[in-house]
């Protein structure tokens, strides 16, 4: 009986030192940012920490060790992180990382930081004292480790079930899906910084993953189908291409009603082509570079590759929401295609999946989509993308300063004709019944390159879907036009035109 009471007392004493024991209140942290000029922030100072009421706050520091020279990267406040609990000193324990990271609790605890890797040494054997141990000592030495271990396991299990881990994966049993391509993402500090865009299915954040910026597209749980569709497209063999958005990971965060679905991709600071054209006028060479790399990306997406770089068969994929908002720009203005939430794959012997007719952005819908007269075959969907490409090429031309003449403010296709928020009926009237297209300005046609590009645009948005050019042909055309205008002749060029209305156009090429 006395042994049972002793065990109970030990357990109670251990439980009394629960998770709140040793917690230090964190209100302010030392702040430092090595990239302060680029990010337009303060370089150093004190940061006041703010967070949710029931969450703990910490300080952190990150630095590099370049051959013994310490290079401080960042300091500041850190969100609720189990790895930082009850740490009064900022100590990094990883053996030899690229970037050292530590976190702690308590005001200004990150003022000093150190690296102390875990060392596994020989086991220390406790030698009992020479006198014969009493029954009490035997019970304490036997039961105390068991009690501590049991409480630690229970505590860890309770915290796993009742808190939303800030940097870990959360699994949903009914749809485990394929494993994420980058399992280390959940082990690295990922911090959301600012919202960059809001779209049909959620918002896009700029985030920091260690020293790199990434984009995090967050879907609410009710848009799970769109998240799954885009994840499946990204996981298709052969989707790694310089003109397709780089995929990093797909994750599920939170539990129950707080569940969020994340897609983590490369971040491009220049944003979308729409945003760039709103604020910038482009040169002839810049126009050619954006247009050629954009066509190259769509051509590769449309291509069926039997054996792609050892990854397997890459099927033809139709984008189905091609527009300037879904074309991102790298720092050198190389185009990158993004947003594959509505994309559909065409695999031999398999149905293409969800192929509802009227999907995408109304303004960029082809005539056959607006009419609801779609042939649900692969070629028909690829030609729909090509109509939209014609509109995006027109947007590029409208902001080019290649010739003398005014460069108008940026406008969306058909904005001049039917405004910024056209209805489906407005577009049916203009595009289908009147067969109108965005207008070419007279002074554009005085430039030999722009004049040829206008011919190519007309062949992209042709009312007859079967007469539209393929993306691969557009890529070749633009390369030839650029060489011609820049002084390199080519026998394969389409004829230079001086007017779109009174010229014999070259034979129109099918999109296949």
Swiss-Prot record:
Gene Ontology molecular function, alphabetical: activin binding; activin receptor activity; ATP binding; metal ion binding
Record organism: Gallus gallus (Chicken)
Domain Protein kinase positions: 190-478
Compartments, record wording: Membrane
UniProt: ATP binding residues: 196-204, 217
Pfam families: Activin_recp (PF01064), Pkinase (PF00069)
Signal peptide span: 1-24
Cytoplasmic side: 159-512
Cysteine-cysteine disulfides: 29-59, 49-77, 84-103, 90-102, 104-109
EC number from the UniProt entry: 2.7.11.30
Tissue and organ distribution: Not expressed in hen anterior pituitary during the ovulatory cycle but expressed in the ovarian follicle.
Record topology, Extracellular segments: 25-137
Lipid bilayer topology: Single-pass type I membrane protein
Superkingdom of source: Eukaryota
Induction line: By activin.
UniProt KW keywords: ATP-binding, Disulfide bond, Glycoprotein, Kinase, Magnesium, Manganese, Membrane, Metal-binding, Nucleotide-binding, Receptor, Serine/threonine-protein kinase, Signal, Transferase, Transmembrane, Transmembrane helix
GO cellular component: activin receptor complex; basal part of cell; plasma membrane
The protein's name in its UniProt record: Activin receptor type-2B
SUPFAM superfamilies per the UniProt record, alphabetical: Protein kinase-like (PK-like) (SSF56112), Snake toxin-like (SSF57302)
Membrane-crossing residue ranges in chain numbering: 138-158
Reactions accelerated catalytically: L-threonyl-[receptor-protein] + ATP = O-phospho-L-threonyl-[receptor-protein] + ADP + H(+); L-seryl-[receptor-protein] + ATP = O-phospho-L-seryl-[receptor-protein] + ADP + H(+)
């Amino acid at each position: 009986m006395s042994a049972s009471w002793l065990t109970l007392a030990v357990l109670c004493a251990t439980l009394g030192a629960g998770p709140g024991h040793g917690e230090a209140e964190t209100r302010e942290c030392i702040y430092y940012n090595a990239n302060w000029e680029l990010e337009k922030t303060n370089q150093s100072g004190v940061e006041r920490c703010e967070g949710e009421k029931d969450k703990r706050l910490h300080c952190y520091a990150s630095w590099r060790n370049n051959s013994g020279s310490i290079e401080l990267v960042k300091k500041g406040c850190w969100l609720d992180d189990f790895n930082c609990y009850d740490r009064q000193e900022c100590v990094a324990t990883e053996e030899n990382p690229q970037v050292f990271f530590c976190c702690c609790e308590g005001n200004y605890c990150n003022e000093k930081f150190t690296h102390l890797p875990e060392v596994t040494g020989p086991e220390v054997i406790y030698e009992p004292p020479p006198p014969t141990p009493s029954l009490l000592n035997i019970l304490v030495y036997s039961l105390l480790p068991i009690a501590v271990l049991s409480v630690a396991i229970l505590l860890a299990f309770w915290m796993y079930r009742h808190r939303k881990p800030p940097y870990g994966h959360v699994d949903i049993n009914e749809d485990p899906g394929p494993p994420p391509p980058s399992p280390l993402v959940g082990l690295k500090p990922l911090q959301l910084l600012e919202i960059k865009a809001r779209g049909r299915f959620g918002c896009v954040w700029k985030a920091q993953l260690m020293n790199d910026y990434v984009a995090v597209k967050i879907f609410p749980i009710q848009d799970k189908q769109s998240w799954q569709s885009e994840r499946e497209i990204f996981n298709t063999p052969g989707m790694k291409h310089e003109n397709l958005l780089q995929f990093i990971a797909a994750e599920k965060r939170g539990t129950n009603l707080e569940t969020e679905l994340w897609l983590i991709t490369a971040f491009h600071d220049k944003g979308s082509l729409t945003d760039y054209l709103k604020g910038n006028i482009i040169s002839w060479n810049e126009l050619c570079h954006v247009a050629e790399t954009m066509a190259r990306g769509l051509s590769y997406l449309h291509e069926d590759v039997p054996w792609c770089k050892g990854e397997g068969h890459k099927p033809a994929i139709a984008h189905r929401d091609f527009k300037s908002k879904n074309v991102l720009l790298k720092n050198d203005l190389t185009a990158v295609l993004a947003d594959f939430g509505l994309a559909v794959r065409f695999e031999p012997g398999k149905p293409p999946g969800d192929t509802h007719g009227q999907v995408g952005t109304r303004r960029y819908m082809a005539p056959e989509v607006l009419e609801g007269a779609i042939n649900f075959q692969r070629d028909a969907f690829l030609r729909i993308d090509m109509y939209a490409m014609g509109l995006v090429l027109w947007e590029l031309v409208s902001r080019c300063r290649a010739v003398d003449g005014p460069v108008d403010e940026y406008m969306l296709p058909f904005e001049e004709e039917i405004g910024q928020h056209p209805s489906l009926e407005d577009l049916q009237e203009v595009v289908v019944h009147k067969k109108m297209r965005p207008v070419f300005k007279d002074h554009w046609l005085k430039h030999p390159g722009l004049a040829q590009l206008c011919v190519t645009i007309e062949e992209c948005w042709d009312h007859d879907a079967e007469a539209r050019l393929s993306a691969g042909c557009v890529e070749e055309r633009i390369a030839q036009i650029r060489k011609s205008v820049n002084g390199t002749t080519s026998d394969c060029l389409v004829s230079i035109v001086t007017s779109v209305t009174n010229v014999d156009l070259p034979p129109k090429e099918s999109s296949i």
